[in-house]
Amino acid sequence: MQQRRPVRRALLSVSDKAGIVEFAQALSARGVELLSTGGTARLLAEKGLPVTEVSDYTGFPEMMDGRVKTLHPKVHGGILGRRGQDDAIMEEHQIQPIDMVVVNLYPFAQTVAREGCSLEDAVENIDIGGPTMVRSAAKNHKDVAIVVKSSDYDAIIKEMDANEGSLTLATRFNLAIKAFEHTAAYDSMIANYFGSMVPAYHGESKEAAGRFPRTLNLNFIKKQDMRYGENSHQQAAFYIEENVKEASVATATQVQGKALSYNNIADTDAALECVKEFAEPACVIVKHANPCGVAVSNSILDAYDRAYKTDPTSAFGGIIAFNRELDAETAQAIISRQFVEVIIAPSASEEALKITAAKQNVRVLICGQWGERAPGLDFKRVNGGLLVQDRDLGMVGAEELRVVTKRQPTEQELRDALFCWKVAKFVKSNAIVYAKNNMTIGIGAGQMSRVYSAKIAGIKAADEGLEVKGSSMASDAFFPFRDGIDAAAAAGVTCVIQPGGSIRDDEVIAAADEHGIAMLFTDMRHFRH
């Protein structure tokens, strides 16, 4: 098999025209004949490039409002023809070989994302000729290069220059993989969209299926292979969504440290998503996907100091997330005080990075600033299936709370209640969080009974010498019995925030009144499993 194939004729037809003129100029300068269609051909001609319209090349005009442009034997025969095997039939039918196909597809995703997009608009943005050429070229990658990403343009020209105008089989095969990934993702988007239109399309209902289509096709790109998974006997890799806009662990840049492990990524995600909940300078310390210390303050240094005090033992080997730039003082405090696996922040000063560089094993991630949280889907794998739900972006403000007890909370109790309610959302259920003066003082996570989570939170506060008297307590779900309130009162809690909704709410409220506790209902639950 010939490893290198010269590029003498290329067909260019792109929706995203970024970089296409420069790429076409580079090809033309290297003696490559250019074929093109529609808007791409007009653009290249306007730039003075010698380009042949596909309709002139085939002798068959574009028709049906551009629906039929490249679906012709002279095009697909030129792409699919096997060099050295189909030469005679190609010559008989005057089919010239096409050595490179440069195609990206109609912007279907952008079209259906527009408000008010009709089914007719969506249908007209389903590319037919493009995917057909892409698949044809990818199938015949032994002889043809298929280019679907503008990010590959420069590398292709460099390789052609290094190989007297040719591309290697390894490159063509790699480009073919990208091509099949591209068409698979494209067809998945269309299938998901059409699936979401059922049953409205068939008149079975006035409403479309909505957020969850009949079949779910997912497209993720591998970012890295892992040494192992959650445990050393499990193989693992990290896949990310394409074109993610929101700052996340998936989009973050690692500026120092060892490669991230499976557990590092999971824990860093938990820490970052929690710290995003706060507008004030905040620090979140996470261990095994649970916050073990959270605080807000006037500076991230003080926020870190206070978060660390919640549970210094658990903070060892933890993940630390900030919602402000990592500065030198805070970096020094962390490095001097504890062993840390990962630090993630929107940015880091040069001085801070010089300090963390002294501990080369510490992983430092820069994620950039974030704006409004983007809606999306959460997935949970079960044996033989996949549970899918909206991301839990729900949160309540002070004006949405209901005071259900005789006593009203003080201003500080209310602030602490809202603070620990935000934290409880990220603690594994059953979750109980004690907070005072904008810092956690005890966290009870993952217990099978809510009362034991409440007891553990109190024990942790006592172990660290943190005063519980006058604190607020958050529960991620309702109290089924009064025992959780009794345990909180015994520890010194004076305000409780919880969803409400138990058949025994009256008993729970009565217990709060007996202890002089103010109780707030959120009418929103935050289970986390």
From Swiss-Prot:
Catalytic activity: (6R)-10-formyltetrahydrofolate + 5-amino-1-(5-phospho-beta-D-ribosyl)imidazole-4-carboxamide = 5-formamido-1-(5-phospho-D-ribosyl)imidazole-4-carboxamide + (6S)-5,6,7,8-tetrahydrofolate; IMP + H2O = 5-formamido-1-(5-phospho-D-ribosyl)imidazole-4-carboxamide
Alphabetical list of CDD domains matching this protein: IMPCH (cd01421)
GO biological process terms on file: 'de novo' IMP biosynthetic process
Matches recorded under SMART domains: AICARFT_IMPCHas, MGS
Residue span(s) of domain MGS-like: 1-148
Pathway assigned to this chain's UniProt record: Purine metabolism; IMP biosynthesis via de novo pathway; 5-formamido-1-(5-phospho-D-ribosyl)imidazole-4-carboxamide from 5-amino-1-(5-phospho-D-ribosyl)imidazole-4-carboxamide (10-formyl THF route): step 1/1; Purine metabolism; IMP biosynthesis via de novo pathway; IMP from 5-formamido-1-(5-phospho-D-ribosyl)imidazole-4-carboxamide: step 1/1
Keywords: Acetylation, Hydrolase, Multifunctional enzyme, Purine biosynthesis, Transferase
Superkingdom as given in the UniProt entry: Bacteria
EC number from the UniProt entry: 2.1.2.3, 3.5.4.10
Residue pairs linked by disulfide bridges in the UniProt entry: none
Gene Ontology cellular component annotations, sorted alphabetically: cytosol
Residues modified as N6-acetyllysine: K287
Alphabetized InterPro entries for the sequence: AICAR_Tfase_dup_dom_sf (IPR024051), Cytidine_deaminase-like (IPR016193), MGS-like_dom (IPR011607), MGS-like_dom_sf (IPR036914), PurH-like (IPR002695)
MF GO annotations: IMP cyclohydrolase activity; phosphoribosylaminoimidazolecarboxamide formyltransferase activity
Domain notes: The IMP cyclohydrolase activity resides in the N-terminal region.
Protein family (similarity comment): Belongs to the PurH family.
Name used for this protein in its record: Bifunctional purine biosynthesis protein PurH
Source species of the chain: Escherichia coli O81 (strain ED1a)
